[in-house]
Curated annotation (Swiss-Prot):
Its EC number is 4.6.1.-. Mg(2+) binds at residues 25, 27, 85. It is found in: Secreted. Its cofactor is Mg(2+). The lineage of its organism: Eukaryota, Metazoa, Ecdysozoa, Arthropoda, Chelicerata. It is an enzyme of class 4 (lyase). The active site is at 5, 41 (nucleophile). This is Dermonecrotic toxin SdSicTox-betaIIB1bv. The keyword Metal-binding applies. One of its GO terms (cellular component) is extracellular region. InterPro entries: PLC-like_Pdiesterase_TIM-brl (IPR017946). Disulfide bonds join 45-51, 47-190.
Amino acid sequence: WIMGHMVNAIEQVGEFLNLGADAIEFDFDFDKDGIAQVTHHGIPCDCGRKCTKKAIFTEYLDNIRQVTTPDDPKFREQLVLLALDLKLQRISSAKAYRAGEDVAKKLLDHYWQRGNSRARAYILLNIPLVEDYEFIRAFKDTLKNEGYESYNDKVGINFSGNEDLDKIRDVLEILGIHKQVWQADGITSCFARGTERLKEALEKRDTPGYNYINKVYAWTLVRKSIMRRSLRLGVDGVMSNNPDRVIKALKEKEFADKFRLATYNDNPWEKFRG
């Protein structure tokens, strides 16, 4: 999976898909009451990127629904995964539950259209910190209470704040989540990062019987040397400002027989058995 990073304006969706991404990540801000308002990262952000691009959250969802709906004029077959970067660290943890309710209802109304939409993308909820785990509980409670619990099959969880992996496992245990879990590791493209935690995540992913990491991705990679390093370690995904560079790396002799771009037929919640 090649995740286009910080795709927060509607016009950027096509731009990143044209560069080769099969997944996009977008940020969204909440108001003080935990209501999702806009797709927006803000300052600071990655080097060389404009930090202030934005869209109204519901309008963004309406557009991305069309882009991921077969037979729609806007349909792009390659887009199979949406990573929602939840800026929960900007609001009180006490509002995390309310935020989870709101996001679930907005997805029901604007993406899934309560069963009337054929939009097919998988959705990855990126939670910045484990202290905001009530967002996940609220999200799942809302799907159940609204009568659409089946959509849980399309939704995965990722804690993206580089926290202790055992601490993350403990929170997933509290929530009763033992599947559909990604683990991110990374840092803004402005800085270098070692591989110790990334290797630990990959080791846990590959441990038989360990159910708290199904996939691992590295972010935000812009240098080909770092992309190659991550591929050699065996990541499932790469988040990048430059998807075209990842595409070129995948075509190199070292990787061409080991990796390919994920499609809709690849389940993002299953561990890869090579």
